């Protein structure tokens, strides 16, 4: 059965979409079957793969609001083994349309349950808003990756997200865990960046990924070409850092799988 990971942080500009786009491509490059769910009305994960939201016949919006099946709504990407369930601006109005629905926080979980077995990993790119769609994503997820920008005020707002995760874990999704904190936009030359990394490690210990995502021009350029960094410039630090993250994530899941007495890695 696949693992559903939400990429979330209510602080904007920390690299959620960049992480989603490039971690997904890197997991696929490691031989995993991966689905991106773009749960942000800005649809940056969708356009970041060169897909025009206006040209899609269905999206996450139709799957949540109109009960379209997820299987058949996803589209292929330029990366073998990676598909995308796209988003569009209509999703911004979905919270109002879903407000009267029974069990409205669990609509995404029910939708993704129908295809979870088809994938090794499903990555959900969350909106910075902690509204109903993000609550749906966290209710559907097995775990959360929290990108943290290597800049001043980096830890600002994390306590609010952690409190939201605690509430969802207690009320809606008892299996929800924090997969890890990921330092993004890291510049090893800056003392502040290293201080933030040490501060994260001091607060959260082993929950902080060893892999860090550097500031990288090619990583910033790639989405405008509709490509992940791994395709746009495979040798760039932006690409290689996400490959390292994918390997770290896979190894972590393999260790956890064996620790529970299983024979084959997830």
Go through each PLM region and give its residues.
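P-loop NTP-binding core
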Residues: 1-266
């Amino acid at each position: 059965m696949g693992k559903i990971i939400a990429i979330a942080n209510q602080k904007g500009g920390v690299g959620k979409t960049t992480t989603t786009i490039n971690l997904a491509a890197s997991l696929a490059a490691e031989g995993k079957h991966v689905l991106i769910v773009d749960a942000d009305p800005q649809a940056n994960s969708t356009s970041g793969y060169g897909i025009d939201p206006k040209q899609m016949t269905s999206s996450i919006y139709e799957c949540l609001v109109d009960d379209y099946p997820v299987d058949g709504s996803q589209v292929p990407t330029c990366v073998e083994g990676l598909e995308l369930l796209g988003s569009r601006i209509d999703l911004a109005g979905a919270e109002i349309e879903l407000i009267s629905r029974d069990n409205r926080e669990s609509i995404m979980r029910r939708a993704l349950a129908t295809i979870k077995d088809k994938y090794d990993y499903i990555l959900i790119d969350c909106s910075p808003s902690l509204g109903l769609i993000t609550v749906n994503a966290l209710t559907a997820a097995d775990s959360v990756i929290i990108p943290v920008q290597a800049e001043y005020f980096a830890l600002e707002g994390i306590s609010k997200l952690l409190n939201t995760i605690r509430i969802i874990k207690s009320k809606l999704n008892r299996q929800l865990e924090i997969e890890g904190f990921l330092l993004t936009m890291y510049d090893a030359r800056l003392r502040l960046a290293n201080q933030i990394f040490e501060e994260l490690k001091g607060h959260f210990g082993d929950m902080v990924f060893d892999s860090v995502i550097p500031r990288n021009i090619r990583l910033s350029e790639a989405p405008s070409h509709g490509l992940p960094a791994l395709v746009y410039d495979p040798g760039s630090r932006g690409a290689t850092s996400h490959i390292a993250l994918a390997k770290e994530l896979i190894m972590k899941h393999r260790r956890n799988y064996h620790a529970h007495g299983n024979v084959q890695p997830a």
